[in-house]
A protein has these predicted regions:
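Structural preference for alpha-helix termini/caps and helix-kink/transition segments
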Residues: 1-189
Length: 189
């Protein structure tokens, strides 16, 4: 037995919303922690595509094909699983365009945010979503930042064993590090 309050102590409301929308409204909804974790992981993939790209001021026609596909899914007996599949196709295209055509990527981000908002998804700041864990016992942001600084110091000193140990410690605490040209970013797994 569980209550919505119990679920919301462990998962964000948006994770639960995604979990519900991922099933067609005429189909039975199979509640399980595993299915909620799948929903949380799926939202993490969408937010990861949005991370680091500001939306364009005006979307233009860059996302027209996805808007058409999304609307067709919604017009097909409110087929939210198919509409969500369109969001993932759009996220994949954003990831492909991220470096090669940043202007198009920004326009596609605008489209993804608009389509996601239709379903009540993708309403949070991507960095904030990816840094929140939902687990009250999780390692704090301050501790994560301190460990990242220690890791960067170890890397500067070419102390690879220490840098790897810190990465492993963060990974064990449910934190994923992403090293890039702009520095190290992190998100909760």
């Amino acid at each position: 037995f569980f209550t919505v309050r119990d679920i919301l102590q462990r998962y964000r409301a948006e994770d639960v919303r995604y979990f519900i929308l991922a099933s067609h409204y005429r189909s039975p909804l199979n509640y399980s922690q595993e299915n909620l974790e799948h929903g949380k992981a799926a939202l993490t993939r969408l937010y990861t595509a949005l991370r680091g790209i500001e939306p364009a001021a005006a979307g233009g026609d860059a996302g027209d094909a996805w808007v058409t596909a999304f609307n067709a899914a919604m017009d097909d007996d409110f087929n939210t699983p198919e509409a969500i599949a369109v969001l993932f196709e759009l996220a994949r295209e954003i990831n492909r365009q991220r470096d090669s055509d940043p202007g198009r990527a920004r326009a596609l981000v605008t489209c993804l945010l608009a389509l996601g908002s239709t379903l009540g998804l993708l309403q949070s700041d991507p960095d904030a979503y990816l840094r929140e864990g939902g687990d009250p016992d999780a390692i704090s942001e301050a501790d994560i930042e301190t460990l990242i600084e220690n890791r960067l110091q170890a890397r500067e000193e070419k102390n690879w064993a220490e840098a790897d140990r810190i990465r492993d410690e963060l990974e064990a605490a449910g934190v994923v590090l992403e090293d890039g040209p702009a520095g190290t970013t992190w998100r909760r797994s």
